Amino acid sequence: EWAVETARLGRDVAEAGGLQAAVGHRGVRLSGGQVQRLALARALACDAEMLLADDVSSALDAATEIELWDSLRASGTTVIGATSKAAALAQADRVVVLAEGELVDQGPWSKLAPRWAHLAG
């Protein structure tokens, strides 16, 4: 249940009828954001200290995305992710900018944004 709450799926699980509810073949009854949060909950349930994620919040609305990042931060789980979303970058403790596989800049998004905001969607 901790993983479900951390992934901001509690209400969705309750509305579906619980953790054992059928969601259809490959989750066809779920929205894109629900599929993303379900995948995150599954990863969190493994009790890993670190997660590697590719655009973990790309299908989420802004409010849910902020709740998700706040929840992940509170969980103490280290998340290393790839994203071009400014909202996700703003939630990061540290942002690394790569160009052609080379490290070209790093730091908090608040300091990097003036130079790199054109890359964030």
Please describe what each predicted stretch is.
Residues 58-71:
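Conserved D-loop/post-Walker B switch-helix segment of ABC ATPase nucleotide-binding domains
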Residues 85, 90-121:
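C-terminal portion of ABC ATPase nucleotide-binding domains
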Residues 40-41, 83:
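Short alpha-helix in the ABC ATPase nucleotide-binding domain helical subdomain
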Residues 77-83:
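Conserved H-loop
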Residues 1-22, 49, 119-121:
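Conserved "ABC signature" C-loop
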Residues 10-38, 53, 60:
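ABC-fold ATPase nucleotide-binding domain signature/coupling loops
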